[in-house]
Amino acid sequence: MDLDQWISKVKDGQHLSEDELQLLCEYVKEILIEESNVQPVNSPVTVCGDIHGQFHDLMKLFQTGGHVPETNYIFMGDFVDRGYNSLEVFTILLLLKARHPANITLLRGNHESRQLTQVYGFYDECQRKYGNANAWRYCTDVFDYLTLSAIIDGTVLCVHGGLSPDVRTIDQIRLIERNCEIPHEGPFCDLMWSDPEDIETWAVSPRGAGWLFGSRVTTEFNHINNLDLVCRAHQLVQEGLKYMFQDKGLVTVWSAPNYCYRCGNVASILSFNDNMEREVKFFTETEENNQMRGPRTGVPYFL
């Protein structure tokens, strides 16, 4: 595998061959299987939210935050679906993981799922670009190996969605069997699907999966686990980044600018330096994505 050549190829807008993609997926699975459900990461590191197939904007993200391996990254899932270039997004992230495994951490999001990708675009995109479903199969097999969360210097937990009534301690996340399709309920599901809300404890989620969780729940979780902050993605934020609750114990990071080529939002990434001091960097859509505006199917954004 000539990873550097493949990286250049994908950045130039070409696809790997089906055989090359299969080789890459198998290689990355061997790296991911060694990672913990709560993968320890050292600062300095930059945390990113949903990308959703917006490849040109991902390239702008790297221009904004720095390139791997000079900058370390945690991507909090939802690499695919909705945008037109899910294949390129996931391929380049896998290539960077293969080339610099210690410098990039890839978390699973609710869209890293066979079920959702058959509805929201990734399956159809693979069919269109390869002429069959093999590429989709190779990629969705990798989904099952992606880790569930990361913890920065023991004090900041990164997870795609949010908290679970079944998870009081970080150790309980470590015990989850993750090598499977995302279940429809339970702690694994909740970590992928839950959302913070201006309530005290728990409420039913309008998404039909996960929970709404409130300020008291978040404060208690952070206290029990000696955390300063929970970082998560999963929800569009017009201003790119949003702290929740009076103690600002949780932050939503959103990294897909002008989401779905029509939402008009800015994107952000959240950097932690060696002293865990935070810096937010904002960016807007690229010209390439600007040209992609057009009629979109009426799929609710919050899934």
UniProtKB/Swiss-Prot annotation:
Tissue: Mostly expressed in flowers. Also detected to a lower extent in stems and leaves. Expressed in roots.
EC number(s) stated in the UniProt entry for this protein: 3.1.3.16
Enzyme class, first EC level, given as a word: hydrolase
Active site location: 111
Site (Required for catalytic activity): 81
Effects seen without this gene: No visible phenotype under normal growth conditions, but the double mutant plants fypp1 and fypp3 exhibit severe developmental defects in roots and leaves, and show defective gravitropism.
Details of cofactor binding: Binds 2 zinc ions per subunit.
Keywords: Cytoplasm, Hydrolase, Manganese, Metal-binding, Protein phosphatase, Zinc
Ligand binding (Zn(2+) 2): 78, 110, 160, 234
Superkingdom of this protein's organism: Eukaryota
Keyword Transmembrane helix: no
UniProt entry tagged with the keyword Metal-binding: yes
GO molecular function: protein serine/threonine phosphatase activity; zinc ion binding
Compartments where located: Cytoplasm
GO-annotated cellular components: cytoplasm
Catalytic activity field: O-phospho-L-seryl-[protein] + H2O = L-seryl-[protein] + phosphate; O-phospho-L-threonyl-[protein] + H2O = L-threonyl-[protein] + phosphate
Record function comment: Catalytic subunit of protein phosphatase 6 (PP6). Dephosphorylates phosphorylated phytochromes, with a preference toward Pfr forms. Plays a major role in the photoperiodic control of flowering time in long days by modulating phytochrome signals in flowering time control. Involved in the regulation of polar auxin transport in roots. Dephosphorylates directly the auxin efflux carriers PIN1 and PIN2, thus promoting their proper polar localization in root cell plasma membrane.
Subunit structure: Interacts with PHYA and PHYB, mostly when they are phosphorylated and in Pfr forms. Interacts with TAP46. Interacts with PIN1 and PIN2. Interacts with ABI5. Interacts with PIF3 and PIF4. Protein phosphatase 6 (PP6) holoenzyme is a heterotrimeric complex formed by the catalytic subunit FYPP, a SAPS domain-containing subunit (SAL) and a protein phosphatase 2A regulatory subunit A (PP2AA).
The protein's name in its UniProt record: Phytochrome-associated serine/threonine-protein phosphatase 1
Gene from which this protein is expressed: FYPP1
